[in-house]
């Protein structure tokens, strides 16, 4: 997975200095990373859920990460918004055992040509378990702190300006 992530970030021309590495999450700690491997459990749909919104506990959102990767399991439910079609698409159906990769808000802030993937998890008739890996930036670099603050304020333009402020890191 590391080689795949490195190739994807290199293809997007993301500077290595602002990507998380050993010891990036906490100064002096080489055993901690700000990348996040999440284990998510989604309860199955019940009759009581019929009138509720189509998502489970995961409403439509984009991830605060450079990239996200997740193995595709046997219970589909992940849906991505396709702005060109104005519709939700479900790329997991029929692709069990594959790996799904999508773009995050940090990549969009770095280069607006890459749009963060808006996604949600739809309800299923069975329990769904997922394990997404979120590849995040090195939070101790000054530019990344500003990027995080801008992303939390839903300000993509401010996040991009923060990335571009440090000319040594962004080419």
Where are these regions (language model features)?
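Catalytic core of Fe(II)/2-oxoglutarate
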Residues: 55, 72-171
């Amino acid at each position: 997975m590391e080689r795949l992530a490195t190739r994807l970030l290199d293809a997007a021309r993301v500077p290595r200095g602002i990507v998380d590495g050993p010891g990036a999450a906490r100064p002096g700690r080489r055993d901690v990373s700000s990348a996040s491997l999440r284990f998510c459990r989604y309860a199955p749909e019940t009759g009581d859920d019929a009138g509720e919104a189509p998502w489970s506990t995961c409403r439509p959102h984009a991830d605060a990460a450079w990239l996200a990767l997740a193995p595709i399991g046997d219970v589909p439910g992940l849906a991505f918004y396709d702005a060109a079609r104005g519709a939700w698409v479900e790329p997991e159906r029929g692709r069990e055992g594959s790996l799904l990769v999508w773009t995050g808000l940090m990549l969009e802030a770095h280069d607006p040509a890459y749009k963060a993937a808006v996604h949600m998890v739809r309800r299923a008739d069975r329990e769904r378990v997922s394990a997404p890996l979120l590849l995040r930036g090195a939070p101790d670099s000054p530019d990344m702190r500003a990027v995080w603050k801008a992303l939390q304020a839903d300000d993509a333009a401010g996040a991009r300006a923060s990335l571009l402020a440090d000319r040594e890191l962004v080419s």
